[in-house]
């Protein structure tokens, strides 16, 4: 049986992550309060932001920006979108 969490983003009980996605208190907070579904959506959005905004993960400013966007995304707040992105038709 998988563990469930009260997801901060979707405001409902959903399947939780199998392990903290990063070390430290922030990783533990995500593990305890963010669902697997929300985390997968964040990873996809993060990839779009890195590619479309040409973020350099070696640059502290870009990493800080991405962390701020992650916090907003996972909290259900308004977050930046990749300019010019058009979702593929299904």
Curated annotation (Swiss-Prot):
GO terms for biological process: cellular response to oxidative stress. Keywords: Iron. Pfam families: Iron_traffic. GO terms for cellular component: cytosol. GO terms for molecular function: iron ion binding. Belongs to the Fe(2+)-trafficking protein family. Could be a mediator in iron transactions between iron acquisition and iron-requiring processes, such as synthesis and/or repair of Fe-S clusters in biosynthetic enzymes. This is Probable Fe(2+)-trafficking protein. It comes from Saccharophagus degradans (strain 2-40 / ATCC 43961 / DSM 17024).
């Amino acid at each position: 049986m998988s563990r469930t969490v009260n997801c901060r983003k979707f405001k409902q009980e959903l399947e939780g992550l199998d392990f903290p996605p990063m070390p430290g208190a922030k990783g533990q907070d995500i593990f305890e309060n963010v669902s697997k579904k929300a985390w997968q959506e964040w990873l996809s959005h993060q990839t779009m932001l890195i590619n479309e905004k040409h973020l350099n993960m070696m640059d502290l400013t870009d990493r800080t920006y991405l962390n701020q966007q992650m916090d907003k995304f996972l909290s259900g707040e308004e977050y930046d979108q990749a300019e010019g992105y058009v979702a593929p038709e299904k």
